[in-house]
């Protein structure tokens, strides 16, 4: 099948590469000329395990190509995926200007019947907006259909999530139109939900909002555990074994970040308000999430005392492991708060330091290893739970720190082990461990 994918971010590039790998002829389009030239040269604009090899393989087999010419891509594709950014406005409303611009160009360039697929995360009603914009910009009437096919990939495992998703959601005006997507996805052999277009749009937002709710809920429980002397990890296990609840996303820590959850929750709150419903539950979820970084820094300040003469090693900057994405990363707020309190910051991340340099305060030192960051520091603060940190030589780390103090924002290590190693160890929703 001939496919055009508009947008080469995480969603668009992975979608295009996977469909090419399944044997389709894919053209990926982006208006960022530097990004397209880099892709043509085999350089990935994002960090995603396995993506570079998949792109190279399919470019070499002439199933995948890249261009800045949107018209060329539109004319090529029987199916056109819109996978452009949908950033939030200050109000929380989703900015659909990129989606509308692509829809207008599709209308102008459409030369035969097309299926236009919204892959971007968009509010309910966007499919109808896209249909109206395309129709309005057609120089002559050409039939087309608009479908919603939301993505559920996770950065760091995007290829696996695209090839083996939990479910494939197809929102289409008719069963006949849906069958085009069913045929395209047939090699993947995963459960498919075929529904109407508005329902598919709501499924995406409702899914992300519910996962955000689980994260904020267990973080609120962690606050209770800290005050009561309970262990949130045991509470999580006891809850997660209930099949009605499940353990996924029931992980206390610094809260959610990234390119999806924060903006999707805000967008759903805004959409609900536009439709006449005050989504108070989601407002509470957002408020709990906003408190997490400040809560950790308060614990740091209470344990270390005044921070204006302290050096702190910050381990992990990306919003989660296995990505270089700094969007809504909790590290930004943690570092800003520590810096504002006078602390000297040394930071390390396996993949995200180049992106972090544009966001963190001037004066932050970026280290080449966690050990370099820790040398002579008064404490280490773990923000992102990379596997590299899980397997650190903690004896070496203790010897490098001026004081053996660790603040673990992700509950990466076991308190009893840290006690045996002689650390003062502060984690989330658990009693502090203090050396004898």
Which role fits each region the language model picked out?
Residues 1-436:
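Structural/interface elements that position substrates and couple domains in central-metabolism enzymes
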